[in-house]
């Protein structure tokens, strides 16, 4: 290993051991990993300190309203034009993009899967993405895709950016390190992270886990933001201070590297002679972040009835129609159940929205059996769903005293658009053939006579 590589490795290790973050959501941050690297009083000096290049990364049109205008200024060792050369076609056949109407024989229905098994071969994060559903059209920046991932090998000299959308990553098994152009995030199960559209990054494992598994929402539309609280007021749900954006960190590495790109559903790769993660300082509001789901402050019914699940929204990606989401990220965290003379689990429902669910930890209160950590369920537009027979009987007859629903964390990617199943998902060996039978015990109780049955 040459001296430059040793210094780069030492610098990366030292940086990783003291990861720091800046609190806040949508803030205009500033950070530098070398003193004086960040220009003061202007964005684009004639010459930057340390011989750096100034470059702007825009996440919105220049003329977007101030409240939705996103950009960051990066001060880097090389400009991004040096981070791509001639592209070659690449293939990741299990990562699909909307519109995707794969041919398969699985008919319409409510669906549930056990966890995707750990890979037998070596897979990086990029190689381990498996698309379950797609919705909308990435080329028109509408809709989303829901993926699962499994991997057991680090992206060492491989880097990736997604021009089709931002990536919301939800680890379920194994902590990961996400090294982006703008800093490093360590993310463990019960945390999430978001990598903005077009931002270069690589993913590695951390800790003792030999394989990592989780979920990804690829959001093609308007970026995720915090939902309006309405009458809830100024506090609760996901509070801005609990979102953490990494401080600047860079990788000064001179060796053959590969940059992979996803653009309008196709993959490309280019070879360069250095790391593209070379941003020494930056300022702006277009940035990655992480969030600990355990800091979510839930609200709920303190008298009777079960409120709509929208009260559990962590993030929402809006459309032009007010209150109609391109995709919502919703969680079902630990909480107290105290409603009186009320059926406390989620009620039976048919919905214009399409719901992709995963379970990070514990049990889900409407499905105590069959829906396991690492599992997936899909309840598509207007298909009925709700508690299974066991959960219904238990909740209908239990003594209604205050109960702490603990040791649980389920989530949902909910979109306005129908979610089309991929061939991979339709033919996955972990698909539960007997899922629909969970409602078989819901027998007729009506006999025409009044009274509680």
From Swiss-Prot:
Question: Any idea of its EC number?
Answer: 1.13.11.5
Please give the pathway this protein is involved in: Amino-acid degradation; L-phenylalanine degradation; acetoacetate and fumarate from L-phenylalanine: step 4/6
Query: Which domain of life does the UniProt lineage start with?
Result: Bacteria
Q: Does the keyword Iron apply?
A: yes
Query: Is Metal-binding one of the keywords UniProt gives this record?
Result: yes
Q: Where does homogentisate bind?
A: 364, 385
GO biological process terms, semicolon-separated: L-phenylalanine catabolic process; tyrosine catabolic process
CDD domains assigned to the protein according to its UniProt record, in alphabetical order: cupin_HGO_N (cd07000)
Annotated Gene Ontology MF terms? homogentisate 1,2-dioxygenase activity; iron ion binding
Q: Which cofactor does it need?
A: Fe cation
Q: Which reaction does it catalyse?
A: homogentisate + O2 = 4-maleylacetoacetate + H(+)
Q: Which GO terms describe its cellular component?
A: cytoplasm
The catalytic residues are 306
Q: Which UniProt keywords apply?
A: Dioxygenase, Iron, Metal-binding, Oxidoreductase, Phenylalanine catabolism, Tyrosine catabolism
InterPro entries, per database record:
HgmA_C, HgmA_N, Homogentis_dOase, Homogentis_dOase_bac, RmlC-like_jellyroll, RmlC_Cupin_sf
- EC class, as a word, reads oxidoreductase
Q: Which residues bind Fe cation?
A: 349, 355, 385
Tell me how this protein assembles: Hexamer; dimer of trimers.
Known function: Involved in the catabolism of homogentisate (2,5-dihydroxyphenylacetate or 2,5-OH-PhAc), a central intermediate in the degradation of phenylalanine and tyrosine. Catalyzes the oxidative ring cleavage of the aromatic ring of homogentisate to yield maleylacetoacetate.
Which family does the record claim for this protein? Belongs to the homogentisate dioxygenase family.
Q: What is this protein called?
A: Homogentisate 1,2-dioxygenase
User: Source species, please?
Assistant: Rhizobium etli (strain ATCC 51251 / DSM 11541 / JCM 21823 / NBRC 15573 / CFN 42)
Q: What is the lineage of its organism?
A: Bacteria, Pseudomonadati, Pseudomonadota, Alphaproteobacteria, Hyphomicrobiales
């Amino acid at each position: 290993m040459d001296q430059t590589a040793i210094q780069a490795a030492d610098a990366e290790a030292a940086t990783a051991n003291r990861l720091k973050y800046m609190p806040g959501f949508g803030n205009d941050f500033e950070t530098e990993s070398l003193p004086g690297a960040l220009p003061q009083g202007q964005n684009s000096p004639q010459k930057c300190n340390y011989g750096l290049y100034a470059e702007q990364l825009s996440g919105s049109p220049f003329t977007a309203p101030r409240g939705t205008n996103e950009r960051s200024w990066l001060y880097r060792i090389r400009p991004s034009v040096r981070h791509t050369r001639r592209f070659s076609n690449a293939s990741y056949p299990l990562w699909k993009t909307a519109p995707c109407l794969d041919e398969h024989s699985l008919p319409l229905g409510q669906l549930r899967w056990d966890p995707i098994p750990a890979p037998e071969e070596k897979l990086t994060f990029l190689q381990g993405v498996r698309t379950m559903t797609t919705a909308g059209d990435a080329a028109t920046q509408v809709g989303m895709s829901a993926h699962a991932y499994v991997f057991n090998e680090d992206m060492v000299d491989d880097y990736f950016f997604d021009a089709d959308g931002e990536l919301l990553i939800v680890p379920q098994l194994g902590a990961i390190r996400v090294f982006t152009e703008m800093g490093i995030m360590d993310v463990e199960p019960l945390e999430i992270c978001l990598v903005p559209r077009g931002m270069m990054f690589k993913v590695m494992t951390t800790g003792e886990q030999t394989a990592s598994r989780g979920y990804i929402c690829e959001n093609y539309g308007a970026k995720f933001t915090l939902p309006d609280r309405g009458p809830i007021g100024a506090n609760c749900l996901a509070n801005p201070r609990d979102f953490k954006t990494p401080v600047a960190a860079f990788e000064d590495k001179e060796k053959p590297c590969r940059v992979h790109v996803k653009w309008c559903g196709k993959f490309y790769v280019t070879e360069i002679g250095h790391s593209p993660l070379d941003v020494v300082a930056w300022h702006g509001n277009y940035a990655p972040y992480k969030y600990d789901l355990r800091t979510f402050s839930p609200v709920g019914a303190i008298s009777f009835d079960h409120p709509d699940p929208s009260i559990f929204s962590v993030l929402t990606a809006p459309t032009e129609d007010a209150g109609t989401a391109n995709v919502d990220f919703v969680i079902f965290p630990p909480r107290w159940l105290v409603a009186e003379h009320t059926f406390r689990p989620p009620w039976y429902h048919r919905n214009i929205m399409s719901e992709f669910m995963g379970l990070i930890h514990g049990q889900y209160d409407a499905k105590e059996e069959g829906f396991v950590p690492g599992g997936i369920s899909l309840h598509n537009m207007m298909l009925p769903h709700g508690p299974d027979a066991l959960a219904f009987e238990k909740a209908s007859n239990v003594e209604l005293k205050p109960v702490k629903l603990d040791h649980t964390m389920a989530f949902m990617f909910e979109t306005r658009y129908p979610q089309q199943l991929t061939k991979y998902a339709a033919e996955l060996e972990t698909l539960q053939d007997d899922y629909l039978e969970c409602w078989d015990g819901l027998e007729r109780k009506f006999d025409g006579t009044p009274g509680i049955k």
